[in-house]
Amino acid sequence: MGILHVHAAATAHELQDIHLVTEALEWFTESEWDVDMTTSYHGPKVAMLSTQIKKKKQLDAFLEKLEPHHPTILAELDARMDENNVIHLRFSLESVIGQKVELMQTYEKGPLIKVRIKLAVYPGQDVQSIASDIFG
């Protein structure tokens, strides 16, 4: 497969329906999300949501939802990948609530889901070819 794991995180404010947001996130990743309630600097409660995907079946389902964005991810791979072979993606939280997957650019504002995809790259392997196998 070439992916070790996927980590995703989002936030929801007290005024939002946290249950609805969590359901949408579970649809998006096919995994359960941890909800950690905390208080923001300004006072209202905020839900810190996170999940980790490691199982092949869940990874395959998640990658299938990203399929319309595979060409964009490959084209922007140099900008989105760090030195630890982690691909950083941002998706619109509002679109996921509507069960659509929209990749966001770094300059776009709004509620988002941060996704980090850790690639399995071993000495002698080319990161570009591994990414092409996954997203190609």
PLM features: what roles do these ranges have?
Residues 6-10, 49, 83-90, 113-118:
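Short glycine-/aliphatic-rich beta-strand segments at the starts of folded cytosolic domains
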Residues 91-136:
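Glycine-rich, aromatic-bearing surface loops/beta-hairpins
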Residues 65-100:
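Mid-chain, well-packed structural core segment of small domains
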Residues 14-15, 52-58, 122-124:
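Helix N-cap motif at beta-to-alpha junctions
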Residues 21-26, 62-69, 131-134:
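Short amphipathic alpha-helices in soluble, non-transmembrane regions
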Residues 28-33, 69-73, 107-112, 135-136:
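A common structural junction motif
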Residues 1-35:
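Long, hydrophobic N-terminal alpha-helical segment
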Residues 35-58:
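Short, charge-patterned binding micro-sites
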